Regions:
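Short, surface-exposed "cap/lid" segments of acyl-processing enzymes
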Residues: 74-75, 80-103
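Primarily recognizes the serine-hydrolase "nucleophile elbow" in alpha/beta-hydrolase
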Residues: 138-139, 143, 148-204
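Catalytic nucleophile-loop/oxyanion-hole region of alpha/beta-hydrolase
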Residues: 91-101, 113-149
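N-terminal cap/lid segment of alpha/beta-hydrolase-fold proteins
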Residues: 2-47, 54-68
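C-terminal catalytic histidine-bearing segment of alpha/beta-hydrolase fold enzymes
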Residues: 252-306
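Short beta-strand/loop motif that positions the catalytic acidic residue
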Residues: 234, 240-242, 246
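Mobile cap/lid helix-loop segments that gate and shape the active-site cleft of serine hydrolases
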Residues: 8, 13-17, 199-230
Length: 306
């Protein structure tokens, strides 16, 4: 099977989000897809049907939708905050992940897909891009707490970099300079083909690699090491996934990151950079299962632990 292209993601079918929130701070709204079934654990095909009468469509108010959702069957919910990639460039927005979020919902995973300022947008770079991510995930956490759901932060490529940055403490320019300890407690952080060392990655000449310079100079000029998760410590449980045939973010970068940190790494054999994002591809099915299994290893939703 040939590697999946970015254009394949744009052409894949999807459902519109169940919720389009009000814009935050004048930025674009969050898009939310509610799970249409209950999440399953590994080795089980059980899918508890949701109360379809409680599924919101064309809803503008998140508060109203949360109220409507209270009549759903009492099942443990997983909420995935999906951070899209695209080389931190304004040329690539979140729309290519609408099919993935639709698929997640069909597999029992609710998802929120925020947007953030990217190079070419006013206010991008440090700190704008990063505070947008911090704010988006804080909103997702508040929603997860309200619903008693498990929260997974998931990012792909440049979005994987931002997810891991959010989960890294002690960097020169890290999220823990912008919030308190509780802000960074999630059930899990998962990064697919993440860019983990900007200094090393930016030495290449690929179309995504050259965007490192744009990212570190778009706002306040920062040292790439100061926003590279490789040089920080983790707040919450973390898993990285490498695509063995990835020409954009080589698998050895992801594997090296996990090895240095003695963290978890899964290598998906025989796939490229975008394969796991396309519904219908076996790697996409594996990704959804990984997210479900990861948060089922311990017992309680975020915020409920002692």
């Amino acid at each position: 099977m040939p590697p999946i292209t970015f254009e394949s993601l744009l052409q894949a079918p999807y459902r519109p989000p169940d919720v389009v929130t009000d814009p935050f701070d004048g930025l674009t709204p969050d898009w939310i897809w509610w799970a249409k079934t209950a999440p399953s654990s590994k080795g089980s095909n059980k899918r508890a049907p949701a109360n379809q009468n409680a599924i919101a469509t064309d809803v503008r108010s998140e508060e109203q939708t949360v109220s409507q959702q209270s009549s759903r069957d009492e099942v443990e919910e997983i909420l995935v905050c999906v951070i899209h990639g695209g080389c931190w460039s304004a040329d690539f927005d979140r729309v290519h992940l609408r099919p993935l979020c639709t698929y997640f919902a069909d597999q029992g995973l609710s998802s929120v897909l925020p947007e953030y300022r990217r190079c070419g947008d006013q206010g991008a770079g440090w700190p704008g891009t990063f505070t947008d991510i911090l704010s988006a995930v804080a909103r997702a956490k508040a929603l997860a707490l309200k619903r008693g759901a498990r929260l997974v932060v998931f990012g792909h490529s440049a979005g994987g970099h931002l997810a891991l940055w959010l989960n890294a403490k002690g960097l020169g320019c890290s999220a823990d300079h912008l919030g308190d300890r509780e802000t960074f407690e999630f059930d899990a952080v998962v990064a697919l083909a993440p860019i983990t060392d900007l200094e090393a990655y930016g030495q290449g000449s690929g179309s995504c690699q050259v965007m490192v310079e744009a990212l570190i100079t778009a706002g306040e000029v920062v040292n790439p090491r100061d926003i590279s998760p490789r040089f920080g410590e983790t707040w919450s449980k973390e898993l990285v996934i490498a695509a063995a045939l990835d020409p954009i973010v080589p698998a050895d970068q992801t594997q090296g990151y996990a090895s240095e940190r003695k963290g978890e790494c899964i290598v998906m054999e025989g796939i490229g950079h975008f394969d796991a994002l396309l519904p219908g591809h076996p790697a996409c099915e594996s990704l959804a299962q990984i997210l479900s299994d990861l948060v089922s290893r311990d017992g309680q939703p975020v915020g409920a632990r002692q």
